């Protein structure tokens, strides 16, 4: 037996209408003594571990379909709403950031794509935004993204309909030409920071 479920309102993809869902009859409920659970705070940004569930899958998908094995990480931020990716890669040529952006638009349906260098911490917004404001010349390093069909809401729903396209942004440093030479980035390597973090417990800091 199938019934129409919803719409329940709030953010797209969570409690929306699901036409012709199976009706499930609950006959018993069991409880764990020590349940493992996570919360969901519904508002402008949903609060649940989407990056953990999607980022690795997106990395495997993009690398396998594009062939760019120098892509190290594909991060899906909490605010993404299926529209935002940050791609960390070992860039080997001036053309490669744009090629990676094009591959992301070809193989995955995301509106905003930012490519950063391998030493960027994609989970640190200060690091990501610093690279954008420090390395991006809009006319040279930003492109209008792929345009997708408009998402039409189910009848009777009131929900946010995202724009049909976003932008691709090359926020890398290595192969760009600037009017004035850029100084080297004053930042420890990711390997060194991981080694330091691994000893926090030893120093009583964890």
Task: Name each model feature, range by range.
Residues 1-206:
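Charged, compositionally biased interaction regions
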């Amino acid at each position: 037996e199938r019934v129409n479920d919803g719409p329940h309102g709030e953010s797209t993809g969570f409690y929306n209408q699901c036409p012709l869902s199976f009706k499930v009859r609950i006959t018993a409920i069991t409880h764990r003594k020590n349940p493992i659970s996570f919360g969901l705070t519904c508002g402008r940004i949903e609060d649940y571990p989407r990056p953990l569930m999607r980022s690795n899958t997106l990395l495997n998908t993009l690398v396998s379909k594009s062939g760019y094995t120098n892509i190290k990480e594909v991060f899906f931020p909490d605010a993404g709403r299926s529209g935002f990716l940050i791609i960390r890669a070992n860039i080997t040529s001036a053309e490669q950031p744009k090629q990676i952006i094009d591959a992301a638009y070809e193989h995955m349906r995301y509106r905003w794509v930012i490519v950063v260098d391998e030493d960027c911490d994609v989970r640190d917004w200060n690091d990501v935004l610093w690279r954008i404001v420090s390395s991006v010349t809009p006319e040279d390093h930003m492109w209008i993204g792929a345009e997708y069909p408009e998402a039409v809401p189910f009848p009777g729903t009131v929900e946010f309909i995202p724009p049909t396209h976003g932008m691709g942004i090359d926020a890398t440093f290595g192969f760009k030409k600037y009017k004035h030479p850029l100084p080297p980035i004053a930042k420890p390597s990711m390997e060194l920071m991981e080694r330091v973090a691994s000893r926090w417990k030893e120093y009583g800091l964890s």
